[in-house]
């Protein structure tokens, strides 16, 4: 409960009302973010909005979303942070573009940052934004980030982050973090120790809205999901470790379990990936003394809860049906 003075003044009462309003809003956001995608229902107002949405494809044809695409996009628009795991060719680019357009239209953010590998920015995003007549700017030097008009898309390559780190940090601060991050091919940050991952987390983890999209959330093992969760949730209360047991290899090279000292707490910002691996995917050392990750998953119910409220997974066949054959 809020601390209330014995004889509150008019100023105290005004502060108390403002604090209670903030607490109610934060609680609503937390409850919405914590809802599992399979349990959510479509919002009628968002449904009407998405029925009017269209985009132009690379052949110059005006396209609309399918019913299933609109259903998934409706659920994503209700949350601040989400990961769209649609298979290649399912329309991820158009979906996350309209998610960003929605935030700009209703002035929830000032700008949209599109972060993608160099090949995706040049071959996908720049042609897509151009053919849809969208205002955008490609950031190649720090000067490009100094005078960015409100409502403009900012296209940024992951390989340029080291060069643009200082200018981007200033831009985020000037915008009061009222930005939307669209991270295309988010599996680029599967290694939590890489410099690229550290740059991306350091610059974008505190933004108001984030949408990640990729066709392959993990490449080898489940531990690679952690950096994407960390970018989305910033080690907040939405990212609580509910695994009561942790696992590690003993001297006899056998997996043994122990109590989790961080149970009920958010994953720590420092070495949180180590705790995530210990909870869900402990490594085993090979005969050469090198740690090797395997496909085993521990505490699967807790992991499924975290994935269920964050990731929407669809295959290309879900959208196209049996019309196409994948060879």
Predicted features, each with a name:
Residues 88-89, 207-222, 230:
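Conserved helicase ATPase motor motifs in RecA-like P-loop NTPase domains
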Residues 155-160, 169-175, 194-208, 238-327:
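Inter-lobe coupling linker of SF2 helicases/translocases
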Residues 1-82, 129, 153, 157-160, ...:
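Charged, low-complexity
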Residues 93-98, 108-130, 221-224:
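Conserved Walker A/P-loop ATP-binding site and its immediately adjacent core
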Residues 119-144, 232-236:
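Conserved helix-turn-beta segment of the N-terminal RecA-like "Helicase ATP-binding" lobe
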Residues 164-165, 187-200, 221-222:
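Conserved ATPase-coupling elements of RecA-like P-loop NTPase cores
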Residues 79-99:
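Walker A/P-loop
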Residues 144-154:
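Conserved motor-coupling elements within RecA-like helicase/translocase cores
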């Amino acid at each position: 409960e809020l601390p209330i003075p014995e004889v509150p003044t008019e100023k105290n009462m005004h502060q108390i009302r403002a604090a209670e309003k903030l607490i109610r809003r934060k609680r609503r956001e937390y409850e919405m973010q914590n809802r599992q995608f399979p349990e959510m229902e479509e919002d009628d107002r968002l449904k009407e909005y998405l029925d009017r949405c269209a985009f132009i494809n690379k052949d110059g044809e005006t396209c609309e979303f399918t019913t299933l695409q609109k259903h998934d996009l409706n659920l994503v628009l209700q949350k601040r942070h989400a990961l769209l795991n649609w298979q290649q060719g399912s329309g991820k680019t158009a979906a996350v573009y309209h998610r960003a357009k929605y935030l700009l239209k209703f002035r929830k953010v000032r700008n949209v940052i599109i972060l993608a590998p160099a090949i995706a920015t040049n071959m996908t995003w720049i042609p897509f934004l151009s053919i849809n007549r969208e205002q955008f700017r490609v950031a190649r030097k720090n000067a490009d980030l100094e005078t960015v008009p409100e409502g403009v898309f900012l296209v940024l390559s992951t390989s340029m982050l080291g060069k643009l780190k200082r200018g981007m940090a200033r831009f985020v601060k000037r915008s009061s973090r009222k930005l939307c991050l669209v991270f295309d091919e988010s599996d680029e940050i599967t290694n939590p120790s890489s410099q690229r991952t550290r740059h991306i987390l350091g610059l974008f983890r505190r933004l108001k809205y984030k949408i990640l999209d990729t066709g392959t959330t993990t490449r080898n093992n489940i531990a690679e999901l952690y950096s994407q969760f960390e970018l989305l949730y910033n080690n907040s209360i939405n990212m609580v470790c509910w695994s009561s047991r942790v696992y590690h290899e003993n001297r006899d090279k056998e997996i043994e379990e122990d109590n989790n000292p961080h149970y009920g707490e958010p994953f720590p910002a420092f070495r949180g990936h180590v705790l995530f691996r210990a909870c869900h995917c402990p490594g085993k050392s090979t005969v050469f003394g090198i740690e090797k990750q395997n496909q085993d998953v521990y505490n699967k119910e807790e992991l499924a809860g975290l994935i269920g409220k964050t990731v929407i997974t669809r295959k290309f066949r879900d959208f196209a049906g049996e019309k196409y054959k994948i060879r």
